[in-house]
Amino acid sequence: MPEINTSHLDEQQVQLLAEMCILIDENDNKIGADTKKNCHLNENIDKGLLHRAFSVFLFNTENKLLLQQRSDAKITFPGCFTNSCCSHPLSNPGELEENDAIGVKRAAQRRLKAELGIPLEEVDPNEMHYLTRIYYKAQSDGIWGEHEIDYILFLKKNVTLNPDPNEIKSYCYVSKEELKELVKKAASGEVKLTPWFKIIVDTFLFKWWDNLNHLSQFVDHEKIHRM
């Protein structure tokens, strides 16, 4: 694996690069494990290294979506606006469990606490709606990137927020109209969106959002949407 100098990067974020992500094939079958660092190097992505991930879309009871702006300390896509929480299940028994994507949901509960400070007892993994999976690849810069199959998780409830500033620069709840304004700002270069969030906004999000209380019609655990 290539040697990359990380001395100029945020110390807390560099420590997270040692976490073991779940390696998969293009059909989301587990084939091994590797570090978060190796999974996010473009040099390895170009050779086909692919890992499992998730994106949480958390709505409050007013049907507003929680957005976060990634901190400037983040190694990939710093300062970009994105959905409520995006991360990876780890290669451990609890998060590898695949029945009803419970392992991915446990990982989401863990990261909602780590990033947004949401108490574990406020989010039961079984409350999350696993809709479908999205495959995508994107470069962050010349060194780092993403190559993931992303599990889409929806959750509607009011929660307590206490974000970690090392993870999150800002956050807000938005209506559909406010998100559309943010997308316009991104198109004009005023702000940046993460590539996975942009893909989901452009394809599925508003249709799902219109049917928050009737999401079962959109559940598709067979297909992987290749973007």
UniProtKB/Swiss-Prot annotation:
The keyword Lipid metabolism applies. It comes from the Eukaryota. Residues 49-199 form the Nudix hydrolase domain. The lineage of its organism: Eukaryota, Metazoa, Chordata, Craniata, Vertebrata. Its main location: other. The gene is IDI1. GO terms for cellular component: peroxisome. The modification N6-acetyllysine is found at residue 176. Monomer. This is Isopentenyl-diphosphate Delta-isomerase 1. Its EC number is 5.3.3.2. Binds 1 Mg(2+) ion per subunit. Its cofactor is Mg(2+). Belongs to the IPP isomerase type 1 family. The keyword Transmembrane helix does not apply. The active site is at residues 86, 148. GO terms for molecular function: isopentenyl-diphosphate delta-isomerase activity; metal ion binding. Signal peptide: none annotated. It is found in: Peroxisome. One of its GO terms (biological process) is dimethylallyl diphosphate biosynthetic process. Keywords: Acetylation, Cholesterol biosynthesis, Cholesterol metabolism, Isomerase, Isoprene biosynthesis, Lipid biosynthesis, Lipid metabolism, Magnesium, Metal-binding, Peroxisome, Steroid biosynthesis, Steroid metabolism, Sterol biosynthesis, Sterol metabolism. A motif (Microbody targeting signal) lies at residues 225-227.
